[in-house]
Structure formats: structure tokens, C-alpha cells
Amino acid sequence: MKSLLTLMMVVALLPAVMATAPLPAFFKVGHRGTRGLMPENTIPAMIRAIEDGANTLEFDVHITKDGKVVVYHDASFDPAYTTKPDGSEIQPSERGNYIFYQMNYNDIRPFRIGEKPYSKFPQQQRMRTYAPLLSEMIDSVEAYNKMHHKAPVYYLLEIKSSEKTDGKEQPAPEEYVEKLMEVKQLKKLGHRLLIQSFDMRPLQVLHQKYPKVILGFLTGDKNVSLYQQLEGLGFLPKFYNPHFSLVTKELLDYCHSKGMKVVPWTVADIEDMKRLKAMGADGIITDYPDRFNKL
């Protein structure tokens, strides 16, 4: 009876313990999954990142015409690595015809990703895959980890938006945020879904309406200081994620003194990865998660 009561108490406490579980000591982030070796922002890229040692999956999302959340980097299909449903090329002049916010997901799904050679990443494995829904990607990753007895991963979601493309490439920040929160709550990810953006507006909406969501500010702007950016943002995010070339010991010390973590992007060179980790970075975003085992 005593052991049964103990078990019941442990089970009762589990949700609270899980909800407040600490973040990883070092974020090993697979950029767009494993962009260096697999078609980016696809389910195979996410699975490969986990196999290669990533504890966090980074990806980009957009909202479709019918209100779905799709995983893809640009606001429209990139002809460099995507082809039409029949396998024919997408001409650069046609990109305006394939803006996700102006397409239903059923019309997006048949486009083919990964079949053609991608000159930026010649090591990418060629295959035929597609742009998944965020919900489908999460389900696939969670099922893979459960099947292979792997630890749960974190999801680092980037909101792709800009004030100048509101209404054309994405909804207003308030609507965008609500679509993401629907998926987050449905999938019960809790603290494992982290959200970052270069656009301050959706971060401000999230901070105001969903203060428990862990947020990160992305930057690659060397002409605007950290202090100016934080003043514009209006609050201290949990993460300040700059381009790796902007990271200094002074920046790291300041961020840490304010309780912010720094996870720079996008680092390919192993020596740069070692240098940033030794300097005190809280993680690294890379196209090559397999290189984490050399740190």
C-alpha cells in the first residue's frame, strides 16, 4: 500500500515537474533540420538531425490561405531545390504564383522537394519529399523518438514575417500568433516549443498574450546595438540569437547578466563551433548537427 501511494504521488507530480523541467545545458540545434545533408525543413531532415545528435530542431513556418501552418523557409517555393508536382522546374518569374499565404495546403503538398541537386549544399541526399504541416512534423518526430527510446527534443520555431508583406505573405502578427498557439496547445509541447523571429511584432504579441512561451530575438544587424534592439523589443527575451560573427565575450557576459541565453547562427566550421562554446555560448545553430560530436 505504501509503495502504491508513493507511485500515485509521483504520477500526480509529473505534470508540474515536466512543465518546469530545465532547458538543455547546451543547445545543439539542427538548422532547418540537417540542411547540410538532407532537404531542408522536411521530416527526413528533422529525423536525421536527431540521429546526428541534435537536441533542438530549428525550422521556419508560414500560414497558408486555409489557415494551416506549413514548414518552409521562404514565403513561396524556392526553385533552387523545389519542383512542380509534375517534376518540371519553377521559373524565378513564377514565384509570385506560389506564395503560401495565397495557396491552400492541399495545393502546396504535391510540390516536390529534394529531387534536384542543390548547389549550395552538394552533400545533400537527394530524395522526393514535401513541405509538411507543422502538426505533422511534430507528430513524426515525437513518434520517432518514442519508437527509438530517445529523449524528447526541443523545437525552435522561426516566425517568418515582415511589416511590408503583411496581408500578402502572412497575416497580421496577432492572427499569425493565434495559429501557432493552436498547434502548440494541440500538441501539448509546453516549454519544448521555443519561438524566435527577426520581426519584433509577433514576439511582442506573444510576450503580452502568452507570457509563458519562451522567446528569442534573432539578429544579423551589426549597425544596431544590442541595447537599441532590446529597447525596441520592450522586454528581455529568454534568447538573444545573433549571427555568429557578432558574438563577443562582452555580448555574452551582458546577456548572461540579464538572464538571456545566446545561441548564435549559422555555424558550419568546427573551429568556430569550438571557439563559441569555449567563449560561453549557450548553444549553436548549425546545418551539420553531426559536427557536435567533435566539440
Describe each model-derived feature in a short phrase.
Residues 18-295:
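Phosphate-group recognition and catalysis centered on beta-loop-alpha active-site segments
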